[in-house]
Amino acid sequence: MTVKGIGIDAVDVARFRTSLARTPSMRQRLFTPEELEYVAPKIDPVPSLAARFAAREAVMKAMGLGLGAFGFHEVWVSRAPSGAPSLRITGRALELAVDRGITVWHLSITHTDLVAIAHVVAE
């Protein structure tokens, strides 16, 4: 397959933590119930949430789009049976991907207590 786009994003975990604390409704606005359920048992879910937010941003960048091109719930991070993260694309985000000939997504996410990073390749 041909690479159609590459996106990478980094999120400052402390800054993201402050935003979540300042606006508690942000969790439901940004993340799907599946994502919130995944991070719920974690002692500190914020780095994992920051990585999932970075994944959304990286998808936008891989498609050459800016913030607001599609809703936050139209792209989310799921887990494959192996435990590997994978992308779920729906709604307007899926329409935009199809328009660009994108049918395959590759995702890598990582985080520390300081930074969360997502790298996306669109084919």
Residue ranges and their predicted role:
Residues 1-123:
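Core catalytic alpha/beta fold that binds nucleotide/phospho-ligands
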